[in-house]
């Protein structure tokens, strides 16, 4: 179901207040998780510390599968931040949505292409930055004309394609999930018959959406490290 976004103009710029609200809430939740997991560290981790250490090892495995740890270790915190932030963002719109005066205030921030494409642009821009920083501009530039200079236009197109697919893949999966949940929720509100018919599919789809949200967070982080490896590793 389509609802208008709460827009606000400031200094000639238009802001989506729902996006501002939801990315702020996502950031706060991730921050709270990080603080709770590291507040009372022990040699025998339990609870939240155990979870965070699992995330640390999981992201480390992603990085080491794409580049050597000496090079990739500097991206460890980036990978952890991305996978946790995107997973939490993907989950926020699953339990419910909040619509006030026809404006959608509560949703998954990753169900908006502006957010996902911004994340994708940030990741691709960082890959170019570190490519120049770690390899030097000359070696970095050679990557666009090797093995043949005639491939240069295709390499440029590839960079734009990588950015678009990285952002739109995440957006498409999360947005489609929320649309279907909204349709199923509409079935729940059509009476006893609609409730009985829709309740099992709704629960099943919410469970599947949790799985999809986790997979999309993993894919985004994995592709981030793939793009980083292509720019910073000499063997790519």
Swiss-Prot record:
The record's keywords, sorted A to Z, are: ATP synthesis, Cell membrane, CF(0), Hydrogen ion transport, Ion transport, Membrane, Transmembrane, Transmembrane helix, Transport
Q: What is the lineage of its organism?
A: Bacteria, Bacillati, Bacillota, Bacilli, Bacillales
UniProt key word Cell membrane:
yes
Q: Which Pfam families match?
A: ATP-synt_A
SUPFAM superfamilies reported for this sequence: F1F0 ATP synthase subunit A
Q: What does this protein do?
A: Key component of the proton channel; it plays a direct role in the translocation of protons across the membrane.
Oligomeric form and interacting partners: F-type ATPases have 2 components, CF(1) - the catalytic core - and CF(0) - the membrane proton channel. CF(1) has five subunits: alpha(3), beta(3), gamma(1), delta(1), epsilon(1). CF(0) has three main subunits: a(1), b(2) and c(9-12). The alpha and beta chains form an alternating ring which encloses part of the gamma chain. CF(1) is attached to CF(0) by a central stalk formed by the gamma and epsilon chains, while a peripheral stalk is formed by the delta and b chains.
Topology with respect to the bilayer: Multi-pass membrane protein
Q: Where are the bilayer-spanning segments? A: 17-37, 80-100, 114-134, 179-199, 203-223
Q: What is this protein called?
A: ATP synthase subunit a
Could you state one GO biological process linked to this protein? Answer: proton motive force-driven plasma membrane ATP synthesis
The main location class comes to membrane
Alphabetized InterPro entries for the sequence: ATP_syn_F0_a_bact/chloroplast (IPR045082), ATP_synth_F0_asu (IPR000568), ATP_synth_F0_asu_AS (IPR023011), F0_ATP_A_sf (IPR035908)
Family of the protein in this entry? Belongs to the ATPase A chain family.
Q: Name one GO molecular function term.
A: proton-transporting ATP synthase activity, rotational mechanism
User: What PROSITE patterns is this protein classified in?
Assistant: ATPASE_A (PS00449)
The UniProt entry's coiled-coil ranges are none
CC per GO annotation: plasma membrane; proton-transporting ATP synthase complex
Q: Is the keyword Repressor in the record?
A: no
Localization recorded for this chain is:
Cell membrane
